[in-house]
Amino acid sequence: MRWLLLLAVALAVPGSAGAAPCSDLPNPIYLQVGDTQTNLMKRLGRALRDNDAKPVTLVFKTAGSCVNIAQIYDATPIAGNENLQYVPSMAEDAAWTPTSPTLTCQAPAGGVVPDIANSALFNSACTTSPPPSTVTLTTGPTQAYVLAVPEASQQTAITFEEAYFVFGFGQLGQIIPWMDETQMFIRTVTKSTLLAWAANISVPADKWKGVRHDGSPMVVSSLTGSTSPEAAIGILGAEVYDGLRDTLNILAFRAKGQYAAYYPDSTSTSRDKKNVRDGHYTVWSPTIWMETVDGSGNPVKPDAHYVIQLIAGRSVTPAIDFDMQAMVAAVGLVPDCAMHVKRSFEGGKLSLYQPAEDCTCKYESLVDTTSCATCSPSQPCSSGVCRDGFCEVQ
């Protein structure tokens, strides 16, 4: 009942005046994440609030990946009394869905160092400094990045060379139709979306031409509101675009040295991220999840470690009562266990990768269809390993 009353206050009086203290929420875990991870935070936040075995409240704010890295490396607190986001439980709001707004709570008056920080690309793209001994890094799902255009645009593809001249030289690049720098919508230099694209088209992040936006929603608004749709182009996380396919299109990208342009998915309308998983689409990064550890390397906050292990696709104790892989797939990310290529730095060369516990068959069944054989205790696999009802490679 207490949280039903607090929820009513939060809904009735927006802003800090009506925000309940975050510390009063059930088992709060504080996160600072990239805005490309908002959809994951909302879905996972709901599931963890209602996770009977271990209820957790994800309390989060969004910021650029480079800012997030510095925040946890330096143990810098989130400002005291800052408004943070969280998701209601089923008991608090049964009608809430991942498309609904988050709720607001107020950070502790003395501030709070994030329990978890997220970078949506290799940390080395932001800093050459190694993590301090008090911070550990875990690789999570893979994040693709796209070049988006308004639905009214007739453009369908772009090459490495064209992107280099468009974003490196703007109007002087003379790449039709992308010559109007006021119609080129990019991000600020701490954001993974810009840094990932910068590494993939060889244009330093601070040299890009275009209108710099702090958040993905601003890029989306600029694209959808453009009065010059043929000239408009912007950079987004693929999972941001996946939720806006009715209003935006993306460009197939031909990377340097390639002979054809590819979408992240096998077609412009599918959601299978096949070309990301097999290396044909090259603009992607791993998500990195950071937590604080003690002098012995043990998590300072075990429940934060629990959350990170979930996101990374690992088994946790106690077991969850929802399907984490299905959640990751639903927001447009790719579980590491479904990837078949890897790289070691942003924009680096790709090499073949075989996950220790493959989940390709299950992932494909979630986002499209799979040709994999099914299995059960009474119907074992003729080859491979039976996992989640499918015969995986290993």
Residue ranges, per PLM feature:
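N-terminal signal peptide c-region/cleavage motif recognized by signal peptidases
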Residues: 14-16
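Flexible loop/hinge segments at secondary-structure junctions
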Residues: 19-394
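Positively charged n-region of N-terminal signal peptides that target proteins for export
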Residues: 1-4
